[in-house]
Amino acid sequence: MSRLQTRFDQLKEQNRAALVTFVTAGDPGYDTSLAILKGLPAAGADVIELGMPFTDPMADGPAIQLANIRALEAKQNLLKTLQMVREFRKGNNDTPLVLMGYFNPIHKYGVPKFIADAKEAGVDGLIVVDMPPEHNGELCDPAQAAGIDFIRLTTPTTDDVRLPTVLNGSSGFVYYVSVAGVTGAGAATLEHVEEAVARLRRHTDLPISIGFGIRTPEQAAAIARLADGVVVGSALIDHIANAKNDQQAIDGVLGLCAALSEGVRNASV
């Protein structure tokens, strides 16, 4: 059984959602990024998404775009990102770790070599935002054959006709991205999420995680009552962007992670 399935199964038994945290590898530099990565599980992260820096992250908002720039300026590349995973695994063999990004760096690295190296490093899953299911044979199928989950993104515009195609070959969990980020989890917004989760559950038995512009423990708790996972990225990355030094970046990210985790754990599912 994969680390992802094990973790979601454990949390289901505890009747709570997973806190899924996203940070960009190498932001603001390798050592600080690794310290953040190593600290996330103890701060309450149940699943970690680690961004693979890319020069043209077209599907990401301003905060993550800037994180990519900072990481690339610090000379982060895919080789170093996999090394970071290896370093993380030396002290943590339980927390699922998913690489998220775009196909171009993987293509340049070489798909067979990437899959072999990712598996050896301890990567559990991939989210590759510009690889539609029509191209499953290029990356999704060989990754899954090696035991690496391939996680699909769905959005409010993914209709019932398209959903089965998108979910075909998906594993690990489904990542639902609400394209309209929120500043406060209002009732209408939560109603929209509840409807989206119900619609997805008609099409898949996989856990459903929501990425939602979540910034506060209260928002995290509200989403945790509706879904299997709560994804937080930009709010964590903002602490790196606004930090005056590396230690402040580490403390800011891990402090917010702990607060979000408390919100998720206190939510009654």
UniProtKB/Swiss-Prot annotation:
Q: Which reaction does it catalyse?
A: (1S,2R)-1-C-(indol-3-yl)glycerol 3-phosphate + L-serine = D-glyceraldehyde 3-phosphate + L-tryptophan + H2O
Instruction: Output the Gene Ontology cellular-component terms.
Output: cytosol
Recorded GO terms, molecular function?
Answer: tryptophan synthase activity
SUPFAM superfamilies with a match to the protein in the record: Ribulose-phoshate binding barrel
- Read off the PANTHER family from this record: TRYPTOPHAN SYNTHASE ALPHA CHAIN, CHLOROPLASTIC, TRYPTOPHAN SYNTHASE, ALPHA CHAIN
Active-site residues (renumbered): 49 (proton acceptor), 60 (proton acceptor)
In terms of HAMAP family, this protein maps to: Trp_synth_alpha
Similarity section: Belongs to the TrpA family.
Assigned keywords, A-Z:
Amino-acid biosynthesis, Aromatic amino acid biosynthesis, Lyase, Tryptophan biosynthesis
Kindly provide the name given to this protein in its UniProt entry.
Tryptophan synthase alpha chain
